[in-house]
């Protein structure tokens, strides 16, 4: 019996796959537990339509990520921060991923989730710093930060 998997089933198939499985296994386990449904012409048509819309959505997300990358990497889009600096040259406060995301939103109107900013530890130095950002699984960008001493 041909079935369309609605969820991943270990050792049998992944979500969206169409496979031939034994009739008893399909009826008594897969279909009963809503892990798969019978592969009728209508169900196959629905699956193909759903896959096309998912591909289109993924392409739109990729295009949006590339557009944001271009915006972030423009030379004039340098994020400015001013912090108090101690005698050792380190800032009293630190620049976190949350602060960077808020700064991008406030200064340039670019909305990025703070979890996409790949900051190993908060920045406590002054000067020009580049921070990597993962916008999409295929698109990475660099945010340029200019951290100044507030006493200057």
UniProtKB/Swiss-Prot annotation:
Q: Does the keyword Plastid apply?
A: no
Pfam families, alphabetized: Ribosomal_L9_C, Ribosomal_L9_N
**What keywords sit in the KW lines?**
Ribonucleoprotein, Ribosomal protein, RNA-binding, rRNA-binding
Does the record bear Repeat in its keywords?
no
Among SUPFAM superfamilies, the record links this protein to: L9 N-domain-like, Ribosomal protein L9 C-domain
Coiled-coil positions: none
Molecular-function GO term, any one? rRNA binding
For this protein, the record's InterPro entries field holds: Ribosomal_bL9 (IPR000244), Ribosomal_bL9/RNase_H1_N (IPR009027), Ribosomal_bL9_bac/chp (IPR020594), Ribosomal_bL9_C (IPR020069), Ribosomal_bL9_C_sf (IPR036791), Ribosomal_bL9_N (IPR020070), Ribosomal_bL9_N_sf (IPR036935)
An individual GO BP term:
translation
Domain of life assignment: Bacteria
Q: What GO cellular component entries does it have?
A: ribonucleoprotein complex; ribosome
PROSITE patterns in UniProt? RIBOSOMAL_L9 (PS00651)
Q: Which family does it belong to?
A: Belongs to the bacterial ribosomal protein bL9 family.
State the HAMAP family in the record: Ribosomal_bL9
Question: What is this protein's function?
Answer: Binds to the 23S rRNA.
Name used for this protein in its record: Large ribosomal subunit protein bL9
According to its UniProt entry, this protein's organism is Streptococcus thermophilus (strain ATCC BAA-491 / LMD-9)
């Amino acid at each position: 019996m041909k079935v369309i998997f609605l969820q991943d089933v270990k050792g049998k198939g992944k979500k969206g796959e169409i496979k031939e499985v034994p009739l008893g296994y399909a009826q008594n386990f897969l279909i009963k537990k809503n892990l798969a449904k019978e592969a009728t012409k209508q169900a196959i048509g629905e699956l193909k339509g759903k896959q096309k819309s998912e591909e289109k959505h993924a392409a739109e997300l990729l295009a949006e990520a590339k557009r944001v990358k271009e915006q972030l990497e423009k030379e004039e889009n340098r994020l400015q921060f001013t912090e108090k600096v101690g005698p050792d040259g380190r800032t009293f406060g630190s620049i976190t991923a949350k602060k960077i995301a808020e700064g991008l939103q406030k200064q340039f109107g670019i909305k990025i989730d703070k979890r996409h900013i790949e900051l190993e530890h908060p920045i406590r130095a002054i000067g020009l710093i580049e921070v990597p950002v993962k916008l999409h699984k295929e698109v990475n960008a660099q945010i340029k930060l200019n951290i100044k001493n507030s006493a200057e």
